[in-house]
Amino acid sequence: MATSKKPFQTNLIKAPNVVTRWTEQMVLELEQCKDPITGPAYFLANFFFIQHPTKGKIKYEAFQYQKELLDAYHNHRFSVNMLGRQLGKTTTAVGYLLWYAMFIDDSTILIAAHKYTGAKEIMQRLRYAYEVCPDHIRAGAKSYNKESIEFDNGSRIEAQTTTETTGRGMSLSLLYADEFAFVPPNIATEFWTSISPTLATGGKAIITSTPNSDEDQFAQIWNEANKRFDEFGNLTELGLNGFFPYMAKWDQHPDRDEIWANTERSRVGEERFRREHECVGANTLVTLKDIYGKIFEVTIAEFYNMC
């Protein structure tokens, strides 16, 4: 167990470069967290805690689609993820970002949220998860602020509102763009144009959102990521833009059924329900292959008319 004095007069934050008295179990747990393949899933399953609005501190327990989402985050350099509302995409991202910062040394992680309140909320969740993480697992903090954390392994996390210049000039290891479809279109386009070169040296990008419109920057990235057939008609893992697409809808949540869906449809209307919970819009593109092997694209509206 850690023996040195804590900084900031609190036990919530681990001091940098603390000397730890190790047990065999602690060493084993740390090594499992460090595993470059299985580490994220192990860390989230065992040491990632969240604040439930009514239950307080609870351990994160991933549903199947969240395990698949984590796999998309970790095993692909570029991933674009479209999920329905309240499916825990941001929570899963927070756990992964914390793991990445603590176990991938010298990482620079940028959280770009569509509003200041969003950036603040993500950092608040991340700070909470860090503060309740055991000392033998977590890295020490050299600086600890509302909008940034710098760890003693050389990694740092910053949260900012998405603007045309957010992240410009930074050498990013990992970009996380949250609710990207809700960034004003002109800002989203300028941001993506300016941020892309900062990832050229090998940085990762994770983009998540509930769909908003059919023509915003998120929709463009999503549509290009879903163009996944090569010249011979074979399905490829990545889209034309190098992104791996992942989608999860309301019915993949085990606590939601048709009774829930019908109630929600009555509350928000059919069109909004389809967009926010079924992740479809009238102009969303899907790629189809006919019985002769011909590949073509149609919109969701056209697809429904074909059925």
Spans of features found by a protein language model:
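Phosphate/NTP-binding elements of NTP-utilizing enzymes
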Residues: 2-283, 289-307
